[in-house]
UniProtKB/Swiss-Prot annotation:
Residue stretches spanning the membrane: 9-29, 54-74, 80-100, 151-171
Membrane-topology descriptor: Multi-pass membrane protein
Domain of life per record: Bacteria
Keyword Transmembrane helix (UniProt): yes
Organism: Bacillus subtilis (strain 168)
InterPro entries named in the record: DUF2179, N-reg_PII/ATP_PRibTrfase_C, UPF0750_membrane, YitT
Localization, UniProt: Cell membrane
Pfam family, one: DUF2179
Coiled coil: none
Protein name as catalogued: UPF0750 membrane protein YitT
Keywords assigned by UniProt, alphabetized: Cell membrane, Membrane, Transmembrane, Transmembrane helix
Length: 280
């Protein structure tokens, strides 16, 4: 348990460092915006810098924006998930204060692509190990509890506002480069983790009862079991079908590996659910 928590903490630190590096060394110096709350923080920092007699850094604004979201997550999502998410935001803010805002390239396209890739690697790793970078991920969790509709619309609306505002503030060329960054970020996160809110896991195993008990001890999810037989070995097994959110994927993978390392698990995207799906 201590080893797992230490590993998770280390991943959160590395993810925050990569996210901060992508912002300070590539995106912010080039006036190219990230997605989600980070992009909102960049926009607010630009507006304050242009129209106010004082300056507030992107990192500070990112932390302030996540305070109400963190409180919401604590009440509606779960304490462990929220603590790691806020820790990720705090570390990102810290690293953004330490790393200099200096451009490694004068080519805006290179900044947009590499900034998006480096930040996305940090975000993807954080998600893969059961945490998040706060902001929209916590909002998405809350929305997923209220309704089973895809939350991609909310991501699209907020990122669309970021692109339009970037165009008004910095010119439409910068807005197009921001669009490149958003595309690259999404593709890299997809490659490392997944952007799908709900997933279906099909687990073929000889230890269905043990896995079932372990799953029920960690999460509240319904499981359907179907008799299965290996075509080559003719061995009798069971296939367990369970629908989870993407934030539970890390816990599920960990359970299956611990109980039955020889189990075969297939994870597929779930586009819709009809019937009861527990949201608590």
């Amino acid at each position: 348990m201590v080893l797992d928590q230490t590993k998770k903490l280390l991943i959160v630190i590395i993810g925050a460092l990569l996210n901060a590096a992508g912002l300070n060394l590539f995106l912010i110096p080039a006036d190219v915006y990230a997605s989600g709350f980070t992009g909102v923080a960049q926009l607010l920092s630009s507006v304050v810098d242009q129209y106010a007699p004082f300056y507030i850094s992107t990192g500070t604004l990112l932390f302030l924006l996540n305070i109400p979201v963190g409180i919401l997550g604590w009440l509606k999502v779960g304490k462990s998930f929220t603590v790691y998410s806020i820790l990720s935001v705090a570390l990102t803010t810290l690293f953004m204060g330490i790393l200099p805002e200096t451009s490694l390239s004068h080519d805006i396209l290179l900044n947009a692509v590499f900034g998006g890739v480096i930040s996305a690697v940090g975000i993807g790793l954080t998600l893969k190990y059961g945490a998040s970078t706060g902001g929209l991920d916590i909002v998405a969790m809350v929305l997923a509890k209220w309704k089973d509709k895809p939350v991609g619309t909310y991501f699209f609306i907020l990122n669309g506002i970021i692109i339009l505002t970037a165009g008004l503030l910095q010119g439409w060329e910068k807005a197009l480069y921001t669009l490149v960054t958003l595309y690259v970020t999404t593709r890299v996160i997809d490659a490392i983790h997944t952007r799908h809110m709900k997933l279906t896991a099909m687990i073929v195993t000889k230890k269905a009862d043990e896995i079932k008990e372990a799953i029920y001890g960690k999460m509240v999810r319904g499981i359907t079991t179907v008799p299965a037989k290996g075509a080559f070995t003719n061995e009798q097994k069971e296939m367990m079908i369970i629908v989870i959110t993407r934030y539970e994927l890390y816990d599920l993978e960990k359970i299956v590996k611990e109980v039955d390392p020889k189990a075969f698990t297939n994870i597929v995207q779930t586009t819709g659910i009809f019937g009861f799906f527990r949201k608590d």
